[in-house]
């Protein structure tokens, strides 16, 4: 089901814009095109691209709407799924298809290993394996910028839960790359870097969220027995 907070976060991030992996043993959601780049065709593309990153196949979904302005560099939004979700789930949840189409923005949904991300000390397969997911996202950005006409001063991050904490980690570690972050339902799980250059960040939480608490960064896992 699509949720109104997701729509709100999406609209918020786009207002900022306009103002300025899976396991190798499992199938890939949505299929793949294999490793390699696409031709420099800018409009009407919707594809999954994969590459080998640190000896693992990692994939992401790119959507370039027909409304992209071919005569100008355009914004890029990376929309990062939460723990146990997939890039397809996040795409359906956030509705960035419609928003990207309406505003001529390139949207990307990365896929985490075992449907998870290493965003800090808690609590996912990718974190336990200490995967370099910040390096992965930066390499995805480089590939999308190389293949499409992207305004590198308008690269934005959003995400849900585990994807929100990874978005904040990316902003903390690489504030020179990203223009702003708007995400939901998690916190920065690292200490602020001394060389961090502040960028706009909006973090959205629900008062009735019983897992990622509004009041602090403790995580409460309910007993499901």
Predicted regions and their residues:
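Hydrophobic alpha-helical segments
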Residues: 1-26
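A domain-start/cap signature at the N-terminus of enzymes
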Residues: 21-76, 102, 129, 158-184, ...
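Short beta-strand/loop motif that positions the catalytic acidic residue
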Residues: 203-205
């Amino acid at each position: 089901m699509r949720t109104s907070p997701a729509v709100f976060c999406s609209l918020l991030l786009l207002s900022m814009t306009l103002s300025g992996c899976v396991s190798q043993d499992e199938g890939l959601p949505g299929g793949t095109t294999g490793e390699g780049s696409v031709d420099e065709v800018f409009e009407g593309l919707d594809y999954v691209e994969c590459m080998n990153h640190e000896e693992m196949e990692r994939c992401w979904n790119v959507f370039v709407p027909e409304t992209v302005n071919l005569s100008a560099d355009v914004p890029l939004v990376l929309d990062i799924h939460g723990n146990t979700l997939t890039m397809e789930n996040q795409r359906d949840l956030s509705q960035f298809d419609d928003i990207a189409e309406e505003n001529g923005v390139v949207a990307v949904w990365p896929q985490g290993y075992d449907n998870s991300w290493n965003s800090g000390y808690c609590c996912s397969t990718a974190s336990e394996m200490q995967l370099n997911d910040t390096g992965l996202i930066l390499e995805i950005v480089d590939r999308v910028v190389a293949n499409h006409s992207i305004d590198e001063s308008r690269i934005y991050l959003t995400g849900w839960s585990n994807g929100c904490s990874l978005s904040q980690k990316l902003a903390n570690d690489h504030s020179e790359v990203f223009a702003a972050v708007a995400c939901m339902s998690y916190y920065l799980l690292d200490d602020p870097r001394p060389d961090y250059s502040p960028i706009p960040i909006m973090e959205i939480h629900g008062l009735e969220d019983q897992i990622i608490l509004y009041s602090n960064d403790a995580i409460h896992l309910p007993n499901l027995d």
